[in-house]
């Protein structure tokens, strides 16, 4: 293999990486995904039947209006703010103050939870099922022993059934996104009662970001030590009784959007729980779990502690909860995919660079320099092998001519020649294969991590996780029309195509005219392929191409013979026209 393949290798890397990325994701999703845990049937389920307002029988109302209809207790930390609904004791008002909806300066914070009766309603609540005992429900009014929930001040909520039992929920929240609820039943009656604690999260409709081969959104959980990505909202609708139940020891269950997550877990990961995904006819989806029934003797108190994550899927935060709270595979609430180890290495290095330089685009460029420096010894050997192959061309051609009627003998003699001259004809392929995991890892890192969301680079690039927004087909926004999808080719993909064309032109032109014509179209194909991908990925490949071009020119000079250098110099001289 010689330098004429350099440009083709880069295009092959891009195309094959895409095939691996989308094809392997399809295979793992449909054939290699974790099998569902056995479906369990039981009598006791969380009592979260929807009222007429919640079930969609009434017109939806603005969030601000609904928030004023019930008594509330404020929530305020450095990461979240909102309120607890004292009617039914629900977490149904929560915004993530570290994240904004859009890039606009006046953009509101991302709203995660909204009360029932509003658009995109999403809430979490706690409760009990039981026998021979009056239980709190969605209309019960709870009392609090404080006027605000903060990271430093938990709040106790009480409800008295006036029959001898007091229900208490102690709610706390940390400085990020983890709530803890201790559900207690204080039995002051004369006889024992049986209760079964539960926690649920309820979401109206499906997420805007649909689940795909490359990114799972929707129902998610860890059951008996295995992450389950295989359930979609549609699967719940099609299930028997619109319910998918699992019995598991520990684990967690919830709903995951691209960047946001609500997850429910027993604080004690050694206990058994019954989990359930279910839906109503009007597309309310619920994830919940119950623990084993508890007999509360007269004069005794029984308590169960549950954890509720409600927030952004920040990588370091999820990793910390996985380790500190022993939540199994909690970091995999981010759908890293099959190449998770490589992707997390990329993420942590990118994040480290970003913390030092303050610009995510610059961090990507520095990562390019790092990777090119690491593989430079391989590239050096590659070009040395290519130079040896070029010098060997006359002998190879002689072997082909001598044994042109005997393919087997010709291959044998060529192998003998390679061994004698100590040349590896496949040495030029290694850098190409190294770029496979790099492409896939960076693609997934920019796709699934919230840390790259809304990260600017320079000039018009305001979000490196999104495609380049400018296109020459509407004069970069001066013309008030949106080009069709196939014409949404931004400036960065065009620059990327130019750098690929420069690489092609800088390579020794030893191709046949027909081959050269075909190769000249490959940069255009890559432009079209890369256009809908994240701008950060395009920035990576632009600078990767430029550095690769500089390395290629230097290595060509270093490993070329005097005759080859003279030939290149003559080709650069302008030809003189005859008089």
Swiss-Prot record:
Keywords in alphabetical order: Cell inner membrane, Cell membrane, Chaperone, Membrane, Protein transport, Transmembrane, Transmembrane helix, Transport
CDD domains per UniProt: 5TM_YidC_Alb3, EcYidC-like_peri
Any one GO molecular-function label of the UniProt entry: membrane insertase activity
Transmembrane segments: 10-30, 330-350, 351-371, 423-443, 478-498, 523-543
Cell compartment(s), UniProt: Cell inner membrane
Gene Ontology cellular-component annotations: plasma membrane
Domain of life according to the entry: Bacteria
GO BP of this protein: protein insertion into membrane; protein transport
InterPro entries linked: Membr_insert_YidC, Membr_insert_YidC_N, YidC/ALB3/OXA1/COX18, YidC/Oxa/ALB_C, YidC_ALB_C, YidC_periplasmic_sf
Chain segments carrying region Disordered: 35-61, 560-579
Keyword Lyase: no
Sequence ranges of Basic and acidic residues compositional bias: 560-572
A UniProt-annotated Pfam family: YidC_periplas
Membrane topology according to the record: Multi-pass membrane protein
Oligomeric and partner information: Interacts with the Sec translocase complex via SecD. Specifically interacts with transmembrane segments of nascent integral membrane proteins during membrane integration.
Family: Belongs to the OXA1/ALB3/YidC family. Type 1 subfamily.
Function summary: Required for the insertion and/or proper folding and/or complex formation of integral membrane proteins into the membrane. Involved in integration of membrane proteins that insert both dependently and independently of the Sec translocase complex, as well as at least some lipoproteins. Aids folding of multispanning membrane proteins.
Protein name stated in the entry: Membrane protein insertase YidC
